[in-house]
């Protein structure tokens, strides 16, 4: 599983002209799944994101987590995070999980995140063309891969 975590002042997701998700201060999480992802990967990623200390404290030091600031979150599925650009110029998405595997992983990730945060998480819609708008805060962007836990 790969995730791109963006600290935002605001973010929204629009589908067919209808805004389906809208947050203020918090995190926009783009999540991409592969066939080899496990329950342990989801649990590790959930804990890591929820507890990342990337929000400023009173001394303007990144020392607070989303949980600490009671921030909001949008999770958007994005299979293109699993792109391979090793060969040629056209990305290959062979590593991306097929919908029958990715959808349950995505839904489980959302449920785990809601349990970890103790509140609802807003989402996009799996497999749908979405317009994702955001106002970066910082900017702060973190990329995490469960296959490379550095």
Name each region found by the language model.
Residues 88-96:
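Short hinge/gating elements
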């Amino acid at each position: 599983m790969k995730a791109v975590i963006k600290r935002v002042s605001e973010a929204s997701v629009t589908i067919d002209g209808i805004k389906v998700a809208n947050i203020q201060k918090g995190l926009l999480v783009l999540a991409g799944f592969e066939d080899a992802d496990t329950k342990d990967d989801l649990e590790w990623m959930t804990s890591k994101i929820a507890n990342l200390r990337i929000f400023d404290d009173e001394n303007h030091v990144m020392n607070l987590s989303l949980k600490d600031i009671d921030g909001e979150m949008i999770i958007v599925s994005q299979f293109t995070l699993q792109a391979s650009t090793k060969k040629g110029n056209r990305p290959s998405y062979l590593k991306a999980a097929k919908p029958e595997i990715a959808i349950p992983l995505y839904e489980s990730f959302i449920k785990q995140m809601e349990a970890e945060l103790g509140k609802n998480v807003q989402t996009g819609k799996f497999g749908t063309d979405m317009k994702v708008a955001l106002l970066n805060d910082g900017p702060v962007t973190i990329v995490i891969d469960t296959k490379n836990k550095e």
